[in-house]
């Protein structure tokens, strides 16, 4: 896999935050002069010039889908994108049980997604014992602030649990 490298933003670049708000408590505030926010939660920050917010939507996926449509891009041209958008709606709306916004309904009905991937994602839950392994490993991690690395020791477990631990570091 290709290693992703952090490149500081310059004046000509754009930082886009999705499903969160730049400067809110759940976002690390990177220095950026051009920031766009795409979110479906209640407004927590001062309004920005590039802000696409709709708290009536059940999912941020719906707002992304609408922005794509407005730009003339049909998400169904890319089945993986359509699947990701659908699964975002699925998870944010309690398995589609809390869909009230007409745009959410339109997206649900119009996306042509890969049902086998959605089924696989729906069935990829962690057991309590696996979550306990991850939790203990994270609580007991050793972090070297000077050199910016962490050492985590976990009990023997499924590689997916190790991946989750790594993602949370």
Name the predicted role of every residue range.
Residues 2-50:
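Active-site cofactor/cluster-binding pocket
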Residues 1, 45-168:
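A structured phosphate/pyrophosphate-recognition subdomain
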């Amino acid at each position: 896999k290709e290693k992703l490298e952090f490149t500081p933003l310059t004046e000509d670049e754009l930082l886009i935050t999705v499903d969160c708000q730049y400067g809110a408590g759940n976002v690390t505030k990177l220095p950026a002069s051009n920031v766009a926010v795409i979110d479906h939660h209640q407004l927590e920050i001062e309004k920005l010039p590039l802000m696409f917010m709709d708290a009536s939507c059940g999912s941020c996926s719906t707002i992304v889908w609408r922005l794509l449509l407005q730009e003339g891009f049909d998400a169904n041209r890319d089945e993986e994108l359509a699947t990701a958008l659908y699964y975002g709606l699925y998870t944010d709306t309690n398995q589609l049980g809390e869909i009230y916004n007409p745009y959410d309904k339109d997206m649900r009905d119009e996306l042509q997604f890969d049902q086998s991937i959605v089924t696989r994602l729906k069935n990829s839950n962690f057991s309590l014992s696996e979550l306990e392994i991850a939790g203990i490993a994270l609580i007991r991690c050793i972090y070297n602030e000077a050199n910016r690395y962490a050492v985590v020791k976990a009990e023997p477990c499924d590689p997916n649990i190790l991946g989750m631990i790594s993602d949370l570091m």
